[in-house]
UniProtKB/Swiss-Prot annotation:
Annotated protein name in UniProt: Non-heme chloroperoxidase
Disulfide feature: none
Positions of the AB hydrolase-1 domain: 26-264
Protein species of origin: Kitasatospora aureofaciens
EC numbers on record: 1.11.1.-
């Protein structure tokens, strides 16, 4: 299987599993918590059919990548992404992040610039700043909320995932119509196969402050979000994000949950392909 080495922990290398398919302009898809690059299958199929080269990779700690106990912060995640881009020598690439993966996109552009990048897309994003503070009243929640998530993951991450996916996909509305029990089970299995340390460390990165990164986005951008998102509510994320980046193309998918890559794949793919074609 293909791997890219991004670091070292004690006697073992830290290797990221990746897939590289198709030809044409490269599109790099960066997954969300607690999934893997395979969560993009409905977008990958559409992009390949449209003539793009599609690269997915599993973030450290998730999927088939190494499961280290170090490097769970967005500076390191962005450095990992930079290593992927440099190793594959990608040029004129499009970065597409989903949920937690949008953080890599923002921090990469801020830290490494856009010499290799043509466009960026933020799907169900966590920008600009989830933490509710005195100087950020639009934040989603106080730090105690995120501490509670970490505690729940440490207590029984497998039970946590079951509840997490209920709201991730809005199963009370979409199970049996827009998503099957089998697809939900696959998400749970993917989550369970990830590292225990990564599962607990990831939520501490969600309240990273990206407000200083956003002004450095100097390529065409797409912000797309579901109005029914219970995981990252649109009023705390995309709508505020768009005000900070008014040049971005902005799309709201009516009624879509956080996990809209699967439940509203047609709407997502239509908007993404239209953005790429411009």
């Amino acid at each position: 299987m293909p791997f890219i080495t991004v670091g070292q922990e004690n006697s073992t290398s830290i290797d990221l599993y990746y897939e590289d398919h198709g030809a044409g302009q490269p599109v790099v898809l960066i997954h969300g918590f607690p999934l893997s690059g395979h969560s993009w299958e409905r977008q990958s199929a559409a992009l390949l059919d449209a003539g793009y080269r599609v690269i997915t990779y599993d973030r450290r700690g998730f999927g088939q990548s190494s499961q280290p106990t170090t490097g769970y912060d967005y500076d390191t995640f962005a450095a990992d992404l930079n290593t992927v881009l440099e190793t594959l020598d990608l040029q004129d690439a499009v970065l597409v992040g989903f949920s937690m993966g949008t953080g890599e996109v923002a921090r990469y552009v801020s830290s490494y610039g856009t010499a290799r990048i043509a466009k960026v897309a933020f799907l169900a994003s966590l920008e600009p700043f989830l933490l509710k503070t005195d100087d950020n009243p639009d934040g989603a929640a106080p730090k105690e909320f995120f501490d509670g998530i970490v505690a729940a993951v440490k207590a029984d991450r497998y039970a946590f995932y079951t509840g997490f996916f209920n709201d991730f996909y809005n199963l009370d509305e979409n199970l049996g119509t827009r998503i099957s029990e089998e697809a939900v089970r696959n998400s749970w299995n993917t989550a369970a196969s990830g590292g225990f340390f990564a599962a607990a460390a990831a939520p501490t990165t969600w309240y990273t402050d990206f407000r200083a990164d956003i002004p450095r986005i100097d390529v065409p951008a797409l912000i797309l979000h579901g109005t029914g998102d219970r995981t990252l509510p649109i009023e705390n994320t995309a709508r505020v994000f768009h005000k900070a980046l008014p040049s971005a193309e902005y799309v709201e998918v009516e009624g879509a949950p956080h996990g809209l890559l699967w439940t509203h794949a047609e709407e997502v793919n239509t908007a993404l392909l239209a953005f790429l074609a411009k």
